Amino acid sequence: MVARSEDYKEALKHQASGRLADAQKICEDILKVQPENPDALHLLGVLVFQLNNPERSIDLINRAIEIHPDNADYHCDLGIVQAALGQLGAANISYDKAIAIRPEFAQAYNNRGLVQAATAQSESAIESYNKALEFIPNFAAAYCNRGIAHTQLRKYELAIVDFNKAISIQPRYGEAYCNLGFVQERIGQPNVALENYNKAIEILPNYDVAYYNRGNVLKSINKHSAAINSYEKAMQIRPDFPFLSGTLLHTKMEICDWEDLEAHQNALLSQVEQGKKASRPLDLHNLFDSPSLHKLATEAWMQSKHPRNTSLGEITKKPICNKIRIGYYSADFREHAVSHLSVDIFESHNRNKFELIAFSYRPEVNDGMYKRVQGAFDQFIEVRNQSDLDIAKHSRDLGIDIAVDLGGLTSGQRPGVFSYRAAPTQVSYLGYGGTMACEYYDYLMADETIIPREHQNYYSEKIVYLPSYQTSALHRARAQKKLTRQELGLPESGFIFCCFNNNIKITPSIFSTWMRILEAVEGSILFLNASNAVAIENIKKEALSHRINPDRIIFKKFLPRAEHLATYGIADLFLDTFPYNAATTANDALWSGLPLLTLVGKSFVSRVGASALNVLQLPELISYSQAEYESRAIELAKSPAQLVAIRKKLQANRTRSPLFDPKHVTKYIESAYIKMHEHYRSALPPEHIWIAED
């Protein structure tokens, strides 16, 4: 036995020095002589886990526990392996057993906190970290982990205190610097966040998460090229970094960097089709006209980031009320496209039948749109510092009947709120063009152009078919004066094609089409939005590669909204992007009397332009192939009489179209809400709903 004890100590030394195979050999030799030696079984279990054989590790540690069930270390290490395998419930039980055996076991409390945080039990996790710190007051990892839990609960000030405490205990704590940077980015301190990401990378040069986070903050301050470099470094360290392939490609598209785009697209396509965590769903919308692909990517995202959570239990059916209580949830109750499209709906709701409550994810902003939206609701609740769980609880406490997500998977939104079932009926509308691909969104509002009946299988939700998918106010802001070509930097003559979509929506394919159109229409120019300086330079280079003088592409500077709307009066034809069409921008153009030529595809976002044109009864502006789109643009530019006739038709139709009649569209939406609520009250499952035009 003595010899074996010495051998065991030698194995521990090898393990501490990283000589895992040597340590494994010694443990196996011990077990040949003493097959029931629990310490050797336990250590061998730990070693094979370190050598990437977790299944065998569990078997070995369990054997050790059978022999010596009152060893807290065995249970704690078993929990570590179980957690690594995703067996979080089992891991939690193992940590509880370790704590029951040794109530002062700080590491077990810390590890249990990690499992609780991973299962959306952040408050319980904080209690576990508090216990760990009670027994080891200078436990840096527990401070760091508690900071992460506070971050999950959006208690950012407490998180910052925890991360700084962890760093004061362990000054070379790279993970704590990275987490501190993440919180600083969240509270609007990108430059300070950048410093902390750089510090994390200095300490841990191969820290992939720090490179990824640094890329995010660089992108947020319009340093796209530096962001790309940081993303590429993260991917070099970890080629399968979750969802990074799409983010990297999306960032390149933001600056119109199309080098090797086709090869990158094909690689990304393959990853998504294999069910890998390859891309955020929104990053695919301007790259692929494929609703099936969009659904696959969204399923991977939602299962990873926002799985269904039943911790609040079923919603108790409340007594019938005189009014249906509608909750609208958004990060965009401000000067934003979503508010431009929705504020008139809020104001037009029938308050005898509906009560409206807003849940705003963003802090108050000092702009007219925020105040207008705020005034349109019966209650306007700022929930930016509440956790997803707390917002869902709040929604239930208020008795929300129908929860309407106005943002989906766009920036700053909170689909996690809906994962807890904030209301009996949950709806996606307006801000996000695609399926949420999960079981807890019941309905998606669209129209028959956007989602034909034969496309329903690409959507997890039941479809609400409105006569008009979107609407905007008749009484729009107007410029105080009429702008001239000269004021906008445009030549005094020549046909003006325009596209005021964000540059990220421009693909090499559609740009090549535009260049052929310019080549065919002598003296014509292309008037584009200017998203960023790098994009402008890259677009000019692309024009040269198509043998088009870059001076024929004029970039519009930022203008106040009223003056921006006036620029549509200068242009002759709006060329839509594909596969990601214009939405609010299309409505602005059409209301201003500017014809919009669109190319229709299969995906939600590639059919929005056609939706608006069909509602306006202008099918002659819808193209079904790139060749048709190109020839039609050239034809209209060379046929002034035909274009004048289309303008007259547009001007006549817009005044009687639901596209510009929010009161009418609100009635359609209210009819849909009533049908949804009737289904719920009758204990019927959601089903497709068609709202007839009156």
Feature locations, PLM:
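Alpha-helical solenoid repeat scaffolds of the TPR/TPR-like class and their adjacent stem/linker regions
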Residues: 1-491, 502, 512, 541-548, ...
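Conserved hydrophobic helix-helix packing surfaces used for dimerization/oligomerization
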Residues: 324-328, 497, 526
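A conserved nucleotide-sugar
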Residues: 353-355, 515-545
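Donor-sugar nucleotide-binding helix/loop cap in glycosyltransferases
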Residues: 575, 589
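CoA-thioester-processing core
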Residues: 608-609
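Substrate-binding clefts and catalytic carboxylate motifs of secreted carbohydrate-active enzymes
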Residues: 498-509
